């Protein structure tokens, strides 16, 4: 899952560094503009091996062999620029950070659960951001 288009290289950076196994931010923007969900369907039908998305956090499930790896470009912190977060910070500053951390944690698990839909299901969780892996390890200890 890609948190932001700017987590990806642009087409110039891809050429300059010879990047092959990633999508450019321009190509992802084109995919995200497709309202038909063509790429999600192609991924679910195994027509493509990799799905890059900023939008597969809710409402789309990838059970069983449909998805065995989930890559987080970074920890899914909430967008604090939204009016909700600004109002909360002003009206209830003592609860702001607790709520913020809880929201981020729930977003992390929501994205993981896109690929986990039954007891025997599994996914590999990958990320260059150690906060993702640390949070997962910490939370999974509390579950088991």
Model-found features: residue ranges?
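Conserved RecA-like helicase motor-core motifs
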Residues: 13-40
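Conserved RecA-like P-loop NTPase helicase motor core
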Residues: 29, 35-133
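Generic domain-boundary/flexible-linker signal
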Residues: 10-11, 81, 136
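Short, internal active-site loops enriched in acidic
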Residues: 5-7, 130-135
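Conserved strand-helix element at the start of the C-terminal RecA-like helicase core
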Residues: 1-15
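Short, low-complexity, polybasic intrinsically disordered segments
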Residues: 133-144
């Amino acid at each position: 899952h890609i948190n932001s288009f700017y987590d990806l290289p642009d087409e110039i950076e891809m050429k300059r560094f010879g990047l092959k196994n990633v999508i450019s931010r321009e190509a992802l923007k084109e995919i995200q503009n497709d309202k038909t969900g063509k790429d999600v369907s192609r991924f679910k039908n195994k027509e493509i091996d990799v799905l890059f998305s900023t939008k597969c956090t809710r409402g789309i499930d990838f059970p069983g062999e449909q998805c065995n790896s989930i890559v987080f470009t970074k920890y899914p912190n909430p967008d604090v620029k939204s009016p909700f977060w600004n109002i909360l910070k002003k009206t209830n500053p003592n609860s702001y950070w607790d709520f913020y951390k809880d929201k981020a944690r729930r977003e992390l698990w929501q994205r993981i659960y896109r690929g986990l839909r039954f007891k025997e299901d599994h996914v590999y969780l990958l990320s260059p951001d150690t906060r993702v892996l640390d949070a997962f390890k910490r939370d999974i200890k509390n579950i088991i």
